[in-house]
Amino acid sequence: MSLPFQPSLFGAGNPAADKMYSTLRRCQLDDESWVDVAPAWLSGADTLFEELAGSAAWDQRERWIHGRHVIEPRLTCGWTVGTSPPPLDDLATLLSQRYGVAFDSIWANYYRDGRDSVAWHGDRVRFSLQRPLVAIVSLGSRRRFGLRPRGGGAGRWFTLDGGDLLVMGGRSQHDWEHTVPKAAHGGPRISITYRHSRESVARPAPGTTD
């Protein structure tokens, strides 16, 4: 089966994460917010993309926004850890061990092409946790991922390829917003997002700081 996007160099084969996080770099957004990025963290990312694209129970949600119904420009699917496909549960375990929190929910967004997107927002987990960690594994086509401070100011942009890992930590959900904008020639992409529901003190993740 041919993939609907340019295959990545290490995209074939069974999904396997880099347990050493050898490519991880930390970007300090401000004194209390940070982002970790680990390029090519997951090998076999194209295999996992195909599996999820063909078997997950994708749904297109409709939401009430500013007094009108809006159809989300993407497909979504969610699991609790322990009920998701085995590769996703395995990644949850690795990330939990690394960051010292119990990731217990998984949410996937399927951007079918460059017209699908997600607007600027902070994850709702910020309403229940002081310093939530949100981990994202990117599959499929390359897309831009942006962050901007809520009070205004310069933002930060990252380009995520299939197999890349991005983790937002500190007060990033409270003080920053993030987005995946439309892309004129964007191909299909799936993002796998891991969240935790209980407060925990995350261990500092070793890595080179920008």
Language-model-detected regions and their locations in the chain:
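Non-heme Fe(II) oxygenase metal-center motifs and adjacent flexible, charged/small-residue loops
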Residues: 1-210
